[in-house]
Regions:
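Conserved S-adenosyl-L-methionine
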Residues: 190-194, 211-220
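SAM-dependent methyltransferase
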Residues: 138-204
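Core SAM-dependent methyltransferase catalytic element
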Residues: 221-237
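Class I SAM-dependent methyltransferase SAM/SAH-binding core
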Residues: 52-94
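A short acidic, Gly/Pro-enriched loop at the edge of an enzyme's catalytic core
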Residues: 96-103
């Protein structure tokens, strides 16, 4: 899997992930301020961090953050963008640390890119180990019931565009993604996601000692309604 994302790193930031990561971060901080005004959330671990945009946002807002991703090329881009943030290349289901964290994030439907359900369960178990008591796991899921499976063209600016189309392969959804500059095809690949429901994910997290604290399509005024924004709380040890 890391080979695919090493290749994806070439165009990852061109696909609009930066904008969504910033919106997710802003909505998340509003949530913490309003729902947990008396708690400290100053240590973050961002798993499946990609090119590190969310980590950069956290640092700019006074939060100590670290990013982990299985793709070495993604981590290289993250390190070049944010040289003063620690990034680690590692399978997030196996990552270990001497520290625990106030909250762990996994944005832009990154958990669904772990396409083996057993690996998803291992990742959740590991998140539990890495969180402090009463810490939060904050993530999002694609709601494929609201996403078109028709071929789509997305203009990024006057010269750059994406063409992508989805189809189902058993429990997976495949994105065929093409990236063009000046009508020249520069990158094409298939990206797979696990089609998992909120109920299914919540059951897995309940099994590891989490409770669902919030489930929203808007996440405090950030209106990417095709994704579920989810907050799970680790129960006190």
């Amino acid at each position: 899997m890391h080979d695919l994302y090493d290749d994806f790193a070439k165009v990852y930031d061109e696909c609009g992930v930066d904008d969504y990561s910033l919106s997710f971060g802003k909505g998340m901080l509003k949530y913490l301020d309003l729902i947990h005004p008396d708690e400290s959330f100053k240590k973050n671990l961002d798993i499946c961090c990609g090119t590190g945009t969310l980590c950069g946002f956290f640092k700019d807002n006074g939060i100590k953050t670290k990013g982990v991703d299985i793709s070495n090329e993604m981590i290289k881009v993250a390190q070049s963008k944010y040289p003063d943030i620690e990034f680690v290349t590692c399978d997030v289901s196996k990552y270990s640390d001497d520290e625990t964290y106030d909250f762990i994030t996994c944005s832009d439907d990154a958990l669904q890119h772990i396409t083996n359900i057993d690996d998803t369960k291992k990742t959740i178990k590991n998140v539990n180990k890495l969180l402090r008591p009463n810490g939060l796991f904050i993530l999002d899921l694609n709601n494929f019931n609201l996403i078109s499976f028709e071929k789509r063209n997305k203009s990024l600016d006057e010269t750059r565009r994406l063409v992508y189309q989805l189809h189902r392969e058993n429990e997976l959804v495949c994105y065929n993604v093409k990236y063009y500059e000046n009508d020249e095809l520069l990158w094409e690949n298939n990206v797979f996601e696990l089609d998992i429901s909120v109920d299914e994910l919540t059951q897995m997290l309940n099994d590891e000692g989490f409770i669902l604290e919030s489930c929203s399509q808007h996440f405090f005024f950030e209106k990417q309604i095709k994704k579920w924004k989810l907050v799970y709380k680790k129960t006190d040890d």
